[in-house]
Amino acid sequence: MKIDMKIKTYIGIFTIMVLLVAAKGDRPAYRVFNGKGHAADYGDILKAARNADVVFFGESHTDPICHWLELQLAKDLYEGKNGHLIIGAEMLERDNQLLLNEYISSMIRKKDFEAEAKLWPNYKTDYAPIVDFAANKGLKFIATNIPRRYSAIVNLKGLEGLDSINALERGMMAPLPLKYNPELACYKKIGEMVAGSPMHMGENLPKAQAIKDATMAWFILKNVNEGYVFFHINGSYHSDNHEGIVWYLKEYNKRNATELKILTITAVEQNDLDELEKDNLGKADFILCIPGDMTQTQEASAIGIAMPPAGITPATPMKDAKADTIKKAAPDSGSGGDDDDDD
């Protein structure tokens, strides 16, 4: 009897220990939710992406999980679409397209491309893998972003500052005059963050963001191909809430008879991955939820991110956020990865 009781006690203790370990379980590097906050997984993303015309991956620029999943999704789309894949990225600007084409077609060496192209400081760790994948498979890769010198002009002088540029220069950006909607939430937030800053930056910084969004949308649309998926990588703020690039893409596509099937993915940070926080609901068709203490490939400041990380808004104070934003958005801030937009 005593032996049975001891056995039961040991079994009870063992069961509790197992339950405690199980409760801790694996520590997931990410969780996926759909826009309504329901649990999803990578397979759901891939299935939806295969059926889309354009897929936006809104990343956090220095997050390793984002970069790894971008590469995996590109590989799986390549296989699932029998090679019918086009890739584009915010991180490469229009005046780099010729160099990019030469590298993709093996006309020039990788080291020559990397030496001559304007690349972000985290290019080798974060973006080279997907560019190299495209090169190895002979995929079309589109440098979608406006050259930063032109967005810097807008940041200084407003959209009117582009009136004097020539036809060749205009070919590297969205058609002018630009349709700009200051009431879009993504632009209003930027304006609020730099309100009261010098040199009309509160007014012009959202316009600089808009010319980037419009240019990326324009060159995505110019390269969309029936039966192909156009997979575009950009900072999350550029496509969150189906605004930014997505809004311009829909505007430019209105002249076409066929509506584009657009899928958006965004990355957010949360301390608790068990459920999607209310503020992150509806940001995209799929939300990639990453631990708040995830290690980063570089400090955000090292690549010139001007706006605060994903999830930080004007209503969520960040130490010296406004001062830091203004400093990084200064007229001569053309160095670094991104001179006048967010992550």
Predicted regions and their residues:
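Composition-driven detection of intrinsically disordered, low-complexity segments
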Residues: 11-13, 329
